[in-house]
Amino acid sequence: MTPKILKVLAMLPLAGMAAALPAAADCALFTSLVKQAETGRGFEEVVPFRSVWDLRESRDTVPADYALPGFDVCWVEDEIWRPDQSDYGAPRYVCRISEKVEATGALSFDSHMAQLRAMGQLSQSVEACVQADERFKLDRKTTSGTSYIMKPELTGNRGMYQNPRAELKISPMVGQYTLTGAPDALPADMRMPMQLDVIIAGPARNLQE
């Protein structure tokens, strides 16, 4: 399942489908989150920054007021690596929405398509917020998503990982699932339940400085 397919599905009507369209993304909240990402302090207005000795290798769920509308869960984490006995990392704000399946792992074709359409609409609404922010430019498009980066000329021409970034990623859900009622001709990459992640990342830094 590629972002392009998701975008096409988002343009199809939802009439007769089971899933409701999620609420549109809040661009004011997006702008606020980017401002916090720029500080490099780990979205401390959303959840308290711990310390360089207590980094968020596990997720800190964000309060409802700071969650992008339409998603199942939002959290803050620290992407950490440790070269030369130092702690480097990049704070990340992540929101995720996943398809809803039955407890048995079964998912009907109609529900699957409706949820993908709704997910596509939600993805487009968030991407519209990113594109409306003139500080961002397209970084790359891949089969799994789209990445935007704050223009380096606005941040002193720092390298890519020294700039705030916004990413939209679509990926298969982990687990065993059974899609029922699907046409035989349905491509394999459209038979798996999917999840959508929106990531707003701050600049990488030496966390011990």
Protein language model annotation of sequence segments:
Residues 183-189:
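Short, exposed beta-strand-loop hairpins at the edges of beta-sheets
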Residues 69-150, 154:
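Long, charged/polar, surface-exposed segments that mediate recognition or autoinhibition
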Residues 1-10:
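Bacterial N-terminal signal peptides that target proteins for export
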Residues 53-70, 139-167, 173-175:
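Ser/Thr-rich, low-complexity intrinsically disordered terminal regions
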Residues 9-18:
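Bacterial N-terminal signal peptides
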Residues 21-94:
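N-terminal leader/targeting segments
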Residues 192-209:
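Short, low-complexity, Pro/Ser/Thr/Gly-rich segments in the mature regions of secreted, periplasmic
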Residues 26-32, 40-55, 112-113, 135-157:
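Negatively charged, low-complexity tracts enriched in Asp/Glu with abundant Ser/Thr
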